[in-house]
Amino acid sequence: MDQSVCNGISYKETGYFSQLVLDFLAEHPHIRSFYTHSPLKPDVEALIRAKKAHPQQRDVLVKALQQQYAGLDTDPAVQRNISLLEQPDTFTICTAHQPNIFTGYLYFAYKVLQTVKMAEAWKAQYPQYDFVPVYYMGSEDNDLDELGSIYLKDQTLTWNTTQEGAVGRMRPEGLDALIAQVEKLLGYGEHAEELVQLLRKAYLGHDNIQEATLYLVNALFGRYGVVVLIPDTPLFKQQYIPVMREELWHQTSHKLVSDTI
């Protein structure tokens, strides 16, 4: 095998990244003051110390997650990780993404799997701690133009719906037709039938997109212990009440932002 095909290319050579992203990855001195930790060699122990010093409501987190997973066939790895979140020496490796239908772009999977890889690597390096991979679902995003399409075999498949508002709360009406298009395009390819059945169970067997996405991500990544967090949950939003009250009475964010200008 020609080993040259296995060589990587730099982010710059792809032409897909802005200069700001390239400077960030290169840790260019002119932007280094805008962030604390290196993207290449983060000081994990410093991160842990900072998180330990920050107030945490682990009981609320675990209770909300248990409610979200109620009735779902959950892998033991996920159950274990949710339980671990109660412990003070457990920390999360998070990625966030909107609930694109059928996961949307391929990098959705890359992002989730990267949390798994980091959690495993950091556990090996710091065995006294536990690290839980978490997918934080941005289910209140209302950009259906972005979230309502997938790209398969050079074709764009779009969900035709008149619903508006938070995509995660939308009903999956009409997605049966889109799944049928996916089935036709996949044909008899490897794992095609398995994938189509998974999409049907996820989207046609649940009341809204965020529940469908939870099911889908759990089916795909639950074996790796990935925990899905849906922030559009009353128990989580109740924790934000003091922040909103502070903002209404004192406009704290305006003062903080003004100090940075």
Which role does the model predict for each range below?
Residues M1-I261:
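N-terminal targeting/trafficking signals and adjacent low-complexity tails
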